[in-house]
Amino acid sequence: MGKPFATYREWQPGSEYHGLSAERITLNEKTLWKGGPNTAKGAEYYWNVNKQSSGVLKEIRQAFLDGDSKKAGYLTQENFNGLGAYEEKDETPFRFGAFTTMGELYVETGLSEINMSNYRRILSLDSAMAVVQFYKDGIRYQRKYFISYPDSVMVMKFTADKGGKQNLVLSYCPNNEAKSHLEADGNDGLVYTGVLNNNGMKFAFRIKAIHKGGTLKAENDRIIVKDADEVVFLLTADTDYKMNFAPDFKDPKAYVGNDPSQTTLAMMDNALKKGYDELYRNHEADYTALFNRVRFEINPEIGTPNLPTYKRLASYKKGVPDYQLEQLYYQFGRYLLIASSRPGNMPANLQGLWHNNTDGPWRVDYHNNINIQMNYWPACPTNLSECTWPLIDFIRSLVKPGEKTAQAYFNARGWTASISANIFGFTAPLSSKSMAWNLNPTVGPWLATHIWEYYDYTRDTKFLKEIGYELIKSSAQFAVDHLWHKPDGTYTAAPSTSPEHGPVDEGVTFAHAVVREILLDAIQASKVLGTDAKERKQWENVLTKLVPYRIGRYGQLLEWSTDIDDPKDEHRHVNHLFGLHPGHTISPVTTPELAQAARVVLEHRGDGATGWSMGWKLNQWARLQDGNHAYKLYGNLLKNGTLDNLWDTHAPFQIDGNFGGTAGITEMLLQSHMGFIQLLPALPDAWANGSISGICAKGNFEVSISWKEGQLEKAIIHSKSGIPCNVRYGDKTLKFKTVKGKKYEITLKGDKLAVL
């Protein structure tokens, strides 16, 4: 891929605050982070580890053997955390850092709301363009915003249907945690350079204005436009951050790259040469090539209310059906992923990339105990596999630092991470002694399962051989080494916790489910490549001796090693159902008894909780193939976990729920995690008629499905790798060989599936 981030930065007018008198635009660049090795003299930064941790493992495990779980918990909380020096006294991470904003632009228009009418704000999912339009004194005004990924530029266009009506003043409000300098760049632009106080990270942006009619001048810190017919603003932005897959731990500048004042200049020169029309054509072609792959319709015979989205959502919350709102939410999730995760940049964080604070919620970091993983659940199934690349590169950047964490805490081979990560390879726990959330060593293997997922959907053997397999293998090595081989011959994860829930335990179900998943992935990957037969046997041996799933006193899947589950517990995390989703070791088809135990858990946990939690439960009910209950969760997500602009809310805004919702809808209509393609596995009664085209199944199949009166009408399966295809619809099955590039139509003929 070359040098990451040199050619493109994904920022958005993502937090636009529209008004007649002024437009306020928050600038977000995902590599603008506080923290990192520059704050800790290089090598010290990577040793945010309690170096005696692995030495205490034997004592902790002996305490479990002795039945003294209290002692085991105490020893764990005293030794399996990070160092307090990495956080300031107010508990705001210092060396860990936080995603921060570049500041805000203001475009003052001189207009008031007097005699204003027909004000509309539009986000077109078809073109990824934001539009503001209104009438003022009989004149139609319009403002357009888009970002061209191929050209690394943000574009804003101000027009009116009468000449000479653009009187604008563009100004900037800086990030107050940086030393900054803003000056005119010629007579038509501004150039800003900044340095974060915390770590010395450099950042810059440039603005150029192009006008028709009237006058334009740049002076000091403003661009002033008078009596113009039309104004186009171009903005380029960058930081000096450089992703590093093999950082030199002695170098405090391991993540420092090119001068952003120069990279933004090159971007701007390119944009100016092309002009507005070409920039828009490039943007539209690039975006639609991804977004238009999938089409989705629910009950198309029912019309769409002609109301603003927030009013439609309000009506939906009152129980008024709106199937087009449901399909809009689905496609909005795909739009958000395209906008926040493109090759050559960081992955989507807790808020995707949209935030307007110097210290956002949870530092707007990468939470590895479900949140970043949930962000990528819809990527491959909704035909956006390219959008997985930022996650893949992020995982690659964690490996070398993660090897230190694996060694320090478990004396293990391979690599792992902890609950929170930043863009500088931070893989250790934070300093908190609250082990319920701070101890989670299997999040590294959970991340690594996405590597196999990407391969399984794309069947890109070159990727698996050159990049993917080593990530999976080294993660599997950690998974094995961190386990406790007990005197009775079983393997268990001790110490471990069920993320954000409950005590330190000698083997929580979640940890075992993740280990089971990564070992199965490693076994399959080694077979595909015909390598590591000896190590594969070890993985297979550990799987046979890993503590199995267990069912508790009220029929529930156990969360911990003992039956302490509370049937009244409605906690938001449903960690012990990892094997149901996103894993694939529990299914009503292959393991019906375990699936029933998972159902009991979900029934007791309830149908509420945070937005992202409802998104997860939606996927789990879909995996249980209960379409009506999955639909209930989807409705709850929209009614109780969605803001007026369709962002997910925790509260506060957290983007993972959007992605979980989109993924869950796909799971309702198509599943392929059990070794076959299952059509309409969880179709709800409410969606009597509909169609979806362009979604993907494992094995590199692209699938389109239509249904009528709740029954399959037909499916089109496009085989992109030419492997055998195994299809299931209800209790009907069909197997057939395929040819690469050929499409196959599947229909019902009598009581059987047939291929045409």
What role is predicted for each listed range?
Residues 1-435, 453, 473, 486, ...:
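Aromatic-residue-lined binding/catalytic grooves and analogous aromatic/hydrophobic interfacial grooves
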Residues 166, 489, 675:
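Residue-level signal for beta-strand positions within conserved beta-sheet cores that form or flank
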Residues 286, 290, 478, 521:
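Solvent-exposed, charged/polar functional surfaces in cytosolic regulatory/catalytic domains
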